[in-house]
Amino acid sequence: MEQRDEKNLGAEILQRIAQQMNDIAEQIAAFALDCAAAMRRVLESEALQEALQAALQEIQADQARPLGSFAEVAAHMEGAHGQNRYQVGDIIQMNHDDFGLIKWRVIGVDVDQAAGHRHTLTVAMERAETYRWFSEPSKEHPFGSNNYPGSAIRFYLNNEFFRGIPEEDAETLLTTCRPCTEHGEASSTCDLVWLLSASEVGFEGNGIPHEGAPYPWYTQGDSAEQRKAVDMDGDEAAYWLRTPNTGNGDYARNVDTDGSLVSYSANYSNGVLAACVIGSSDSSAPVGASERRDAHE
């Protein structure tokens, strides 16, 4: 009899435990439902939406690429994780003494390397702010010469044009050595400001000398569209390249208004689209020579 009572008591205890566990499970389920409902209310609340929006704006502001001066760009070039914060296609602006606000297109990121600078941006003017002849007529070359190293346009870029760049912006520019053709022979120039070559804007073949690999901006999308430019009045503009027409010493290559490659006599007035390299200000190294990275050539 006592054994049976003990068994009954044990069964009752187990039943109570099971009931309690079931009650606890129901309470947990109810709590979970309450938590889910509370979480849903929080997620749908206007306060949270405003907080998330504010946080997103703060992140975007922290990561924003400033469209300020070259000096500002150089100071902000390196991101939080050591990467270059700028991208091919970005527009950077600079106030020039002669032309006012000039917009520059990023055509290469970390392409033209420089000792002492972790990052660089290669930029080219978005529009032709002036028209110039390639070189002056002379007794030897009545229609001008297509020899870029000794050209009037190279002298203009590194003297009159360069002097119009604000000092703090000019200090960010790196002397860049670029391949060119001099009197039919392979040569190079080392300048702070320079003209792009036919090969650098994506042309090849048909007697075009290799004067540098295409910059990334000219290898994406429709290359002809990428090459098109306008002038200071918003009209379509043809502009000079530093590449000669190897079949005629009086003719230099240029990009026509439709983005194609043509040649004009060197004493013709064409648009000027300067290019240059901005070095990041993450180093105390002085402005020095940059070197085109071989990886994309």
Report each predicted region and the residues it spans.
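Short, aromatic- and cysteine-enriched interfacial helices/patches
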Residues: G10, V42-L43, F99
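Heptad-repeat coiled-coil amphipathic alpha-helices that mediate oligomerization/assembly
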Residues: I17, I24, F31, C35, ...
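Generic alpha-helical hydrophobic packing signal
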Residues: Q15, Q20, K103-V106
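A general secondary-structure boundary signal
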Residues: A18, A38, G89-I91
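Gram-positive cell-envelope targeting signals
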Residues: M1-D5, L9, I13, Q20, ...
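Collagenous Gly-X-Y triple-helix signature in extracellular proteins
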Residues: A55-E297
